[in-house]
Amino acid sequence: ATAGQVIKCKAAVAWEAGKPLSLEEVEVAPPRAGEVRIKVVATGVCHTDAYTLSGSDPEGAFPVILGHEGAGLVESVGEGVTKFKAGDTVIPLYVPQCGECKFCKNPKTNLCQKIRVTQGRGLMPDNTSRFTCKGKQLFHFMGTSTFSEYTVVADISLANVDPKAPLDKVCLLGCGISTGYGAALNTAKVEPGSTCAVFGLGAVGLAAIMGCKVAGATRIIGVDINPEKFGKAAEFGATECLNPKDHARPVQEVLVEMTDGGVDYSFECIGNVEIMRSALEACHKGWGESVIIGVAGAGQEIATRPFQLVTGRVWKATAFGGWKSVESVPKLVEDYMNKKLKVDEFVTHTLPFDSINEGFDLMHAGKSIRCVLTF
């Protein structure tokens, strides 16, 4: 009944950087050609949302509807959309997969570039927005904008998933879990019997630990300055945990000593350029690989001595865990449904959508792994 009409609904609007989100009634325009309008059922709160809200994101544009870790149901589709219909169960994707650009055709990357420019501007592929509030246009975020009861996404930024999947859980496969898990499996390609170190034990770090374990790593060292996170890390497969604050010398030196020369694989799940250096330098000479997952602030640069690389260490990074999104997310949902992949264990808090600012507070306080908001 709502197809083709503007929908008025609730959304959390970020009017400006550094201020709490404001619950507002917004207007969501119908989907145009190649677009899909979704009724969002659940959305996670991720550090990336807070990063943009803080003003550190070079692409951050305000006012905006944030959120990029959601799941919902298709409300209506725009002209020419064939892969989705009203009622489909879907997960929006901030890394699309058009299947046609040279990036999609190359097995070495998952970074589809079809709508990259407009997505970076906070707009739909035709360079306009579908959101208004109080007469003002609002920007989209990461091509998803899940902090709204209804959102509009490009049809290439959407995965069709099992309708039996609980959306208040699988929404997390839209970012954090898939990212950390894929970093271990796809980007590092962790080998059986290896030793790994994971820096930062939030949702992404725990997912990286889970990936290392699935890949057969025998020693997985969790590193965090908050020892309250060590119990959960052990549940996910960490064989030991290390608090850099317990040591006077740099953490990489401690790790190199603990592991007889360094780890085979390390993962930086924080977004701190100093820790990125520590993670690389904790790697074993000759073959150690470090994967950067965390997003650093605008203008920050990484540093190490070239000698670290000349002597056989590899520095790489990943976006969305290297998964080609449209084809991979439905499989990840299936793995979860078949109990091959943990998701429920990441959800520490489930709150009504109106409590979104409380969700951000829990995250900043280190009290939540993932907080899911339900509409």
From Swiss-Prot:
It catalyses: a primary alcohol + NAD(+) = an aldehyde + NADH + H(+); a secondary alcohol + NAD(+) = a ketone + NADH + H(+); S-(hydroxymethyl)glutathione + NADP(+) = S-formylglutathione + NADPH + H(+); S-(hydroxymethyl)glutathione + NAD(+) = S-formylglutathione + NADH + H(+). Keywords: Acetylation, Cytoplasm, Metal-binding, NAD, Oxidoreductase, Zinc. One of its GO terms (cellular component) is cytosol. It is found in: Cytoplasm. Homodimer or heterodimer with L chain. InterPro entries: ADH-like_C, ADH-like_N, ADH_3, ADH_Zn_CS, GroES-like_sf, NAD(P)-bd_dom_sf, PKS_ER. One of its GO terms (molecular function) is S-(hydroxymethyl)glutathione dehydrogenase (NADP+) activity. PROSITE patterns: ADH_ZINC. Zn(2+) 1 binds at C46, H68, C175. Transmembrane segments: none annotated. Zn(2+) 2 binds at C98, C101, C104, C112. It comes from Gadus morhua. GO terms for biological process: formaldehyde catabolic process. Class-III ADH is remarkably ineffective in oxidizing ethanol, but it readily catalyzes the oxidation of long-chain primary alcohols and the oxidation of S-(hydroxymethyl) glutathione. This is Alcohol dehydrogenase class-3 chain H. SMART domains: PKS_ER. Disulfide bonds: none annotated. The modification N-acetylalanine is found at A1. The lineage of its organism: Eukaryota, Metazoa, Chordata, Craniata, Vertebrata.
